[in-house]
Amino acid sequence: MKIFYKAINMTLSMFTVIPLPKYEWDDRAAKHIMKLYPFIGLIIGILWYLSFFVLSKLNVPIMLMAALILTVPYILTGFLHLDGFMDVSDALLSRRDKETKLRILKDSTVGAFSVISVVLLLLVEFAGIFTVLNKNLDMRILIFIPIASRTMNGYFIVSQEMLGQSSLAKFFKEGTGKVDEIILLGIYVLVALITFFTLGINYLIAILAMGLISFILLLKVKKELGGINGDVAGYILVLMEFTGILLLGII
């Protein structure tokens, strides 16, 4: 139980900016981090929904509310995944050979493609959130979207070939196996079912579309880069959540 508590502490510290008591790193607890990744999604999702609830009670104008809601998950995660999205976008959009793409991925310099990509992403995501608010949809979906994205991310990290030898994602994979993969896939199915029974079919379609786009992105990245790492996981997570919001704005 103590190991599990440490794992929760470590997971929250790694993937959020939520202040926590100091702790000592424990390699035995690290193997549980990916299984707890959906829990991080739950925390972020609840805080995301609460931000909407508070803003709506304050009668904040819809356009401003959409902009503020957009920032919440990025702020809570310290822009960790958005940074990965920018790095991978820069590499993939360069249209260079595999070795050059990998070199670009490791380069800390902010490239033009990454800037263009993040600006377009945030503009369209803002429009999506604004549309969802304007359509008066059930905003409890904000709880489920981060859980789904992090569940699939955890599954990819424990099941896929790692990119590079020094990847932190590779460290998280150590000590995991088929049981972890089954648990994470089971959680995704559970999230989909709860979404359907509490919110309805349109919201289920959004969750399933997030899963579909994640596999499409995974295949693309594996083809062009050869595997997955922390940046790739962030890239997939950001586009999964973007897909969920965008689809709700359309259907």
Swiss-Prot record:
GO cellular component, one term: plasma membrane
Catalytic activity: alpha-ribazole + adenosylcob(III)inamide-GDP = adenosylcob(III)alamin + GMP + H(+); alpha-ribazole 5'-phosphate + adenosylcob(III)inamide-GDP = adenosylcob(III)alamin 5'-phosphate + GMP + H(+)
Keyword flag Transferase: yes
Transmembrane segments: 36-56, 60-80, 110-130, 181-201, 202-222, 231-251
Pathway: Cofactor biosynthesis; adenosylcobalamin biosynthesis; adenosylcobalamin from cob(II)yrinate a,c-diamide: step 7/7
EC number(s) stated in the UniProt entry for this protein: 2.7.8.26
Membrane topology: Multi-pass membrane protein
GO MF entries: adenosylcobinamide-GDP ribazoletransferase activity; cobalamin 5'-phosphate synthase activity
Cellular location(s): Cell membrane
Similarity field: Belongs to the CobS family.
Function: Joins adenosylcobinamide-GDP and alpha-ribazole to generate adenosylcobalamin (Ado-cobalamin). Also synthesizes adenosylcobalamin 5'-phosphate from adenosylcobinamide-GDP and alpha-ribazole 5'-phosphate.
Protein name in the entry: Adenosylcobinamide-GDP ribazoletransferase
Organism: Clostridium perfringens (strain SM101 / Type A)
